[in-house]
Regions:
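Gly/Ser-rich phosphate-binding catalytic loop and adjacent alpha/beta segment
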Residues: 2-10, 17-146
Length: 146
């Protein structure tokens, strides 16, 4: 790893995750969130196929690349849909029959923010309990690394 992992735990919200990038989360932190999500996915299905996309921000592709590295490290197979809208990612779970989805977006937030909307159950994004589990997994991964 080239830089110290930075993840502000307050970025994990009820239904998604949002941070100022790179102030509150850096690339290594995004990679760890990808590992955490991958860990959740492989508990449901081994060798899962995950569709991933990103929004129009100039740094979103970079964030997506870190996130995908984390997913792949857990054994997930990733299909990158590239620059797209959130509904495209949600629809991909049905049209492409993917096992999980992730969208790199800060939605309506101003430039400087990044975020991740994700889901495993078809047609649904993570709920409070799943986001809490993800936060716990990521924090456990950090303790393991240190």
């Amino acid at each position: 790893m080239s830089e110290t992992i930075k993840i502000d735990p307050y970025g994990f919200r009820e239904y998604d995750a949002r941070w100022l990038y790179p102030k509150n989360i850096n690339g290594e932190g995004i990679r760890e969130v990808g590992r955490g999500f991958g860990t959740q996915i492989i508990k449901v299905k081994k060798n899962a196929r995950v569709t991933v996309g990103y929004d129009y921000r100039s740094y979103s592709e970079e964030v997506k690349n870190y996130f995908v590295e984390g997913l792949i490290s857990t054994g997930c197979n990733v299909e990158d849909l590239g620059l797209c809208l959130s509904p495209t990612i949600y629809y991909s779970q049905f049209d492409l029959n993917s096992d999980a989805v992730a969208m790199i977006t800060a939605s309506h937030n101003e430039n400087g923010w990044t975020g991740i909307k994700m889901g495993i159950r078809k047609g649904l994004t993570h709920c409070y309990e799943e986001m809490k589990e993800l936060k716990d997994i990521v924090q456990d991964l950090q303790r393991y690394i240190q």
